[in-house]
Amino acid sequence: MKQQPLLGFTFALITAMAWGSLPIALKQVLSVMNAQTIVWYRFIIAAVSLLALLAYKKQLPELMKVRQYAWIMLIGVIGLTSNFLLFSSSLNYIEPSVAQIFIHLSSFGMLICGVLIFKEKLGLHQKIGLFLLLIGLGLFFNDRFDAFAGLNQYSTGVILGVGGALIWVAYGMAQKLMLRKFNSQQILLMMYLGCAIAFMPMADFSQVQELTPLALICFIYCCLNTLIGYGSYAEALNRWDVSKVSVVITLVPLFTILFSHIAHYFSPADFAAPELNNISYIGAFVVVCGAILSAIGHKLLPHKNH
């Protein structure tokens, strides 16, 4: 693989910005459209676009191989559909900056599953990173502990957000197994098609007609975001080291906070400012530091000589 650091960084940054801005746009659409319908449109547009691309490149997955991996693909579809639905639903109860802080639970969930299923070893840097993640989350929610005392609107949103991040691990593990026979784009195509089929009975297509001009713009962006985010992510991995791309991706929650402030500044009537105190901002930074340490800590911490 030819290294192109500048292009790799650019695509990784586009990915982080796309994923960071997504919940802000989603929240606008959710005021008119239910989560199932939004998710179906996102999946079907991504699936059709990717199908056309792979057909043009003559790289469509072989049917025989697809049948061999049907059960694994089903697990992945369940994980991805649940992730999209739970994350979108959480925005009905909590603000985007809170929903996005849980994104790193997915990567740590993958690490733990790697230890339990594939017998991989958890490095010291990953253990410290996990510790920082927990500390950071505690700081982030420093003024919200009372909200977790019972099942209320806020705690419901948090439960949905955490559930969405953790269930994504099922997709991540399925993808890891399927990479033995398919490339990443072929896997995404199969997952997108499977998810679109799963959500079709639940989608209410008439809700598109009820979108306001702002909600329509946000809706179109949400649909394109899947292609922009995952497409840029794939291009970044083709041009730059995985560990370096991962570091940039850890900035997603910070971009969500930044974009929330920018959106509120330009249109306070439509976009709410993040309700975070100074300790919460520190907590968000600590969460990101924990994720960065987990991604590249092996290069920062001294190795033992054997």
UniProtKB/Swiss-Prot annotation:
Pfam entry (one): EamA
Domain EamA span(s) in chain numbering: 17-142, 166-296
Source organism per UniProt: Haemophilus influenzae (strain ATCC 51907 / DSM 11121 / KW20 / Rd)
Chain ranges passing through the membrane: 6-26, 35-55, 69-89, 98-118, 122-142, 154-174, 186-206, 211-231, 247-267, 281-301
The keyword Nucleotide-binding is assigned to this record: no
Cellular component GO terms held in the UniProt record: membrane; plasma membrane
Primary subcellular site in the record, as a coarse category: membrane
Family, per entry: Belongs to the EamA transporter family.
PANTHER family associated with the record: EAMA DOMAIN-CONTAINING PROTEIN, INNER MEMBRANE TRANSPORTER
Keyword Lyase set for record: no
InterPro entries: AA-Vitamin_Transporters (IPR050638), EamA_dom (IPR000620)
Assigned keywords, A-Z: Cell membrane, Membrane, Repeat, Transmembrane, Transmembrane helix, Transport
Subcellular location: Cell membrane
Bilayer topology term: Multi-pass membrane protein
Protein name: Uncharacterized transporter HI_0878
